[in-house]
């Protein structure tokens, strides 16, 4: 094989690597191919979202669910009102969703990740400690007050904690109509069927008694 052929082969291999690793990193939801496609939630979703409704009206493009107040009398002292394709079908194929997140004093939105979206948010009221962790276990965090904004890169574990003495509120947005949410405590200890104790005791370097106690708190 000549030097020119070897160089050409290496160049093609390099292009293949670029295509495999770079192009997926730029993607989020697929781009729409029409002005809108209000989701028909009675139909089964496809890979790009729900099929379009046969007829639409102005009400399909407006949503009032981000108002408050929400009931924050929950175990974690937090409540979320989502505006995603399942609650607001007008978002179907548009690659966008939002949440209203409200905290009681001391309330925590526990460590979780959104596998299909980057998250951006703004504090509407209160003081919120926001943090996310990178894949090398570095924590980036800051206390934010009303009017201040944060961003969490796609898929990274993050949390929010109301460090104030009064309620706090965030409005968050995502570059996906259905970003998904994997909440670490309930994912690990409340799965159905449950993760075997042997896996969890080894992972967390603890015993069956501790694992069973945690499972009892997150049992579905």
Swiss-Prot record:
Instruction: Keywords in alphabetical order, please.
Output: Apoplast, Disulfide bond, Glycoprotein, Manganese, Metal-binding, Secreted, Signal
Q: Tell me the function of this protein.
A: May play a role in plant defense. Probably has no oxalate oxidase activity even if the active site is conserved.
Subcellular location field? Secreted, Extracellular space, Apoplast
The similarity comment for this entry is: Belongs to the germin family.
Chain segments annotated as transmembrane: none
Superkingdom: Eukaryota
As given in the record, the signal peptide range reads 1-27
Provide GO CC annotations from the record: apoplast
For this chain, the annotated S-S bridges are 37-52
Family matches, as CDD domains: cupin_OxOx
Q: Name one GO molecular function term.
A: manganese ion binding
Q: How does it assemble?
A: Oligomer (believed to be a pentamer but probably hexamer).
Q: What is this protein called?
A: Germin-like protein subfamily T member 2
């Amino acid at each position: 094989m000549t030097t020119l052929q070897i160089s050409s082969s290496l160049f093609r291999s390099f292009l293949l690597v670029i295509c495999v690793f770079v192009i997926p990193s730029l993607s989020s939801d697929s781009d729409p191919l029409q002005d809108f496609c209000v989701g028909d939630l009675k139909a089964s979703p496809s890979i790009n979202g729900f099929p379009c409704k046969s007829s639409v009206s102005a009400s399909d493009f407006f949503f009032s669910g981000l108002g408050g107040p929400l009931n924050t009398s929950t175990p974690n002292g937090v409540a979320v009102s989502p505006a995603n394709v399942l609650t607001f079908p007008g978002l179907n194929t548009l690659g966008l969703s939002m949440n209203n997140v409200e905290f009681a004093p001391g309330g925590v939105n526990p460590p979780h990740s959104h596998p299909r979206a980057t998250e951006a948010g703004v504090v509407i009221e209160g003081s919120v400690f926001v943090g996310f962790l990178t894949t090398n276990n570095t924590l980036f965090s800051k206390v934010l007050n009303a009017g201040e904004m944060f961003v969490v890169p796609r898929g990274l574990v993050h949390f929010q904690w109301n460090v104030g003495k009064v309620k706090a509120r965030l409005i968050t947005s995502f570059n996906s109509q259905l970003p998904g949410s994997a909440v670490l405590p309930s994912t690990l200890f409340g799965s159905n069927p449950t993760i075997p104790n042997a896996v969890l005791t080894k992972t967390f370097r603890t015993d069956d008694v501790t694992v069973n106690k945690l499972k009892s708190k997150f049992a579905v």
